[in-house]
Amino acid sequence: MDARSLQVREVAATPAQLRALVARHPGLFPALFDSTAVGPLGRYSILVAAPGASLLLRGDGKLEARGVATRNKDFLGALDEWWSSARTEPADTDATGELPFRGGWLVYLGYELADHIETGLHLPALRADAVCALAQRVTAALVHDHLVGRTRLVAAGTAAETIAAIEAALAALGPAGAAAAPAAPPMSPIDATLRVAEQPPASFRDAVLRAQQYIAAGDVYQANLSRGWQLELASPADAGALFESLRRANPAPFAAHASLPGMRLLSSSPERLVRVCGRCVETRPIAGTRARHGTPGSDAT
């Protein structure tokens, strides 16, 4: 990114309006990184916009490159090659202040991508057309600073017509002080669910026992077990309404609403996995890292 092409200006937009934009215009706004925090840890909500070239790995292992010149058939290898070729000097910090976005990539890595890194894991198979991983270039974003209560439009080499489309979508919501309700009322998960499928309890217990054996043998110091649920709904779900319900039930500093090919991704987490700023790498794990009581015996009860 050329620092001279960077545009930053303040706009009138509330967090509720950012949530409405990602729900109503997924083609222009592919993902919202949402925060309910009031402190510095989850200071920003970032609505990325203007999606461009992409790498898409399907469940059948096929890599789709759109606007990316690569002969690499491996997703991570192709992404590393692309990132290295597109990397430039950072923009002048005076232009962005403390803004966390200056143009970049929207990246989704599914659990199943682990099977491409470490073979022999025997993970559940994805549908052939499902998204396993995605990397997409994004050049613009609406960034809301919760500490000072203002929103800025950041555009790094974004076409003028795309910036105009962003501003038009925001203006169509009405004044910043107006309520930006989701497209449908909040859903009751109990009333809306037709069928629930989950991993058999015995299978999960076996995984716990294996993890304990690995820890005792010194192979690992921690094992994170994931358990999936599949819900079949009685009627089509409105992603914006579901995200509003999730946000009320589990407010978090690190939440997301993303639109991927053929799917919507909603998440809510209290934990930031990793932050990289220059030569500084920061991780803040919060699960399974502290004893509950003073002795191992007390912890076991």
Residue ranges and their predicted role:
Residues 1-301:
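Extended alpha-helical targeting/anchoring segments
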